[in-house]
Amino acid sequence: MGASGPVIANVLVDHPEAVLCNPEEMTAQRELWVSVCPNKKELIGIIEKFPASFFTSASHHNNQRNNIAYFQSLNLNKRIITKLMASAPQSFSRPVEQNQVMVDTLQRSYLELGGEKLNMKIWLQKLLSQNPFVLLKSAEALRQNLLFLRDRGFTTAELLHLLSKLRGFVTELHPDSMNQTLQYSQEMMACSGDELREIVLKCPALLYYPKHILTERFEGLLGAGISVSQIIDTPTVLELTTQIVNYRLQKLAAHGYDARTGSLDVLNGTKKDFEQSYGKLRLRVERPLFNPVAPLKTYD
């Protein structure tokens, strides 16, 4: 395949069991992978990064072949199929019928929640790309969680929004844990059921966090002087750990920004998002904006 010596060495260090594969198994496996990833350079990169996904038992080859054919029948992009094989090899080692059940459930849920059939393939590709492990989850868990959220008053359009935003991780939730999380959040924010649903739609990840994590984060924010109304306006701040919140508050305060009286949007987001917001704020402080309507000085 043209792999270099260092690449082969890395593969053997990470997955020494590769030496147990005989040439016939290697040839069969290579043919399977080339059917979805014909670019040899890309395939070598995948093998180096996910050696255990490539060097699998010959007993799995029939299941792998059937699963590849199934996903190709869905007209999924080859890159998506390759990513699934590399990131979640267990889903290709098992009988194809198990993947069919989960995919059918996802597609049915998408359509029942008002999704357009024309866009279903794109939606499914995006979901599988973001969370390849969704195929290994229980289809019944997905149905039960959607039913629970429907009973909490979420409309079909809102449920589709949550299913898309949660990237299939809704299968990892449980009605009891979600119920505890929602009850605690409603108590802390003293909001109505309708207001709570709006908060969840702004911050779907809120459904993930158990009570003890939310308790720590609420206490951290309130202890730093952030008000409940600010949290309601920008609930995604609850996705940040207390340590990250305190660090960002200190950096903002160093440049004269008081988050207790301003918007929490600048505090929010990933590290990259924050650095960009922080950089813009610092520039505004260090370089006063030009006022285009101020009278110009004239000289006689």
Model-derived features: positions:
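Long amphipathic alpha-helical repeat/alpha-solenoid cores
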Residues: 1-300
